[in-house]
Amino acid sequence: MEVAAGARGGGAGGGGGGPAPFLLKTYEMVDDPSTDAVVSWSDASDASFVVWNHPEFAARLLPAYFKHSNFSSFIRQLNTYGFRKIDPERWEFANEYFIKGQKHLLKNIHRRKPIHSHSHPPGALPDNERAIFEDEIERLSREKSNLQADLWKSKQQQSGTMNQIEDLERRVLGMEQRQTKMIAFLQQASKNPQFVNKLVKMAEASSIFTDAFNKKRRLPGLDYSIENTETTSFYDDHSSTSKQETGNLLNQHFSDKLRLGLCPAMTESNIITLSTQSSNEDNRSPHGKHPECDMMGRECLPLVPQMMELSDTGTSICPSKSSCFAPPISDEGLLTCHLSLTLASCSMDVDKSQGLNANGTTIDNPTEAATATMEKDDTIDRSFDDNQKKSADSRTADATTPRADARVASEAPAAPAAVVNDKFWEQFLTERPGCSETEEASSGLRTDTSREQMENRQAYDHSRNDREDVEQLKL
C-alpha cells in the first residue's frame, strides 16, 4: 500500500513540476529493504543501484510498480532519463541526481528527446531532402505513365495480331475446302471417258495449230472490193499491204509447206499478161465456162483466210480449208500463191505428179523445178520491158487519138505471146480457139491503158519485194 501511495504521490508531484513518476517509482523500489534480494543500492557507492535477479525482477516487481513485465522496456526508460550502465558484468545503473537519501534531487533529472520523434509534422523536413523526395516521386510517376502506355500498345498489337491470325485461319480453311471440292470434282470427272478424251485431245493439240484456226486473215495481194475481178489483177489495191500480210501469214512451223505455194516465180509478165487473159481463158477450158462456180469463188474468198488451191474442174477458184495441213502438191505447189490464184480459171491438170521443164520433160526434184521457173520469169521480164517501151512510144506519139489508144490496148496482151516460146508457158499464154468473143468483151473494159500499166507496174514492184521476202524465208 505504501508503494502505491508513493506512486500516486510521485505522479501528482510530477504533474505539478516535480520529478517524473517513473523516477519516483524506481527510487521507492530500490530504497525498499524488502526488495534488496532482487534490487538494491550498490555496495560500493550510494549513487547507483544493481538488479541482482532480473528474471524475478521482471516477474514480480515490474508488474507491481509499472504494470508490465518487460525488462528491456525498463532499460530503455532508464536510458531516456540519462541513466547509464556502469559495470558490463552486471545490471548496475547510475545517474548523478539519483542518490540514496536525497530524493529531492530527482527533479533535476529530465527525459531526453528521442532521435526519431513522431511528434514532428511532415512539413518539418529540410528543403533539400524534400526536393530529393519530390524529384524521386516525379520520376516514378513518369515511369509509371510510360509503363501504362507500353502496356496499352501491347494490348492493341495483341488484338490486331489475333484478328490477323483469325483471318488467316479462315482463309486457310477456305483454301482447304476449295481444294477438297476440286479433288472431288476431278475424281468424278476422271470417271467420265468423254471428259478424259477431250483432255487428251487438248493436250495433243499444239498452240500453233490453234492460232492458225482462230486467226482470220486475208490472202496477201487479193482485192475483194473491186467488182470486175475477171479483168483486173489480184494485186490492184492490196499490193501495198501484201508484204506485211505475207509476213504475218508465213509461220516458221509452216515454212516448208507454204514455200511450195509461195515460190518466188511471180513476175510482172505473170501479173499483166495473165490478169488480162484471165477472162479469155475461161472459154478455152475443155469443160467450158461455169459462171456459177466463178461467182461462188468470188463470194467465198473474203471468208476463207486459208490457202487457196486450184479446183479439179480447172475453171474457178475454190477455197480449201484442209490445204493448210495437207501434204504439199508436187507440180503446182512450185508455183506461187499469186500465180495459182490468177490462173485458177485456166484449164490446168491439177493432179499432175511431176513438173515440166523448159523442154516439156518431167522434173522430179522440186528445187530444179523452182530454178527452171525462175529462168522462165526472167525471160518474161524482158518481154515485159519491151512491151512497156512500145506502149510508152505509142502513147507519146498518139496521145490525142482514140484509135491509137485502142491499138495499144489491142497490142498489149499479144506481145508476150510472140516472145515466149516455152512449152511450159504455151499452155497458159497461147491463144486458143473460142476466145475472140471474150477478148472483145474484155477489150472494151480496158479503155485507159496508161492507168492499167501504172497499176501493173506498182503491182510488179510489190511482187518483187514479196519474192525477195519469200527467198529469205526459204534460206
Swiss-Prot record:
**Which stretches does UniProt call biased (Low complexity)?**
397-415
Q: Name one GO biological process term.
A: cellular response to heat
Q: Name one GO molecular function term.
A: sequence-specific DNA binding
Q: Which Gene3D superfamilies match?
A: Winged helix-like DNA-binding domain superfamily/Winged helix DNA-binding domain (1.10.10.10)
Cellular localization per UniProt: Cytoplasm; Nucleus
Q: Which UniProt keywords apply?
A: Coiled coil, Cytoplasm, DNA-binding, Nucleus, Phosphoprotein, Stress response, Transcription, Transcription regulation
Q: Which cysteines link up through disulfide bonds? A: none
What domain of life?
A: Eukaryota
Residues of the region (Hydrophobic repeat HR-A/B) are 140-190
Coiled-coil region(s) at which residues? 129-202
**Motif Nuclear localization signal location, chain numbering:** 214-218
Keyword check for Nuclease, yes or no.
no
Spell out the residue ranges making up region: Disordered.
357-415, 430-475
Query: What kind of modification does the protein receive after translation?
Result: Exhibits temperature-dependent phosphorylation.
Q: What does this protein do?
A: Transcriptional regulator that specifically binds DNA of heat shock promoter elements (HSE).
Q: Which family does it belong to?
A: Belongs to the HSF family. Class A subfamily.
Q: What is this protein called?
A: Heat stress transcription factor A-5
Q: Which organism is it from?
A: Oryza sativa subsp. japonica
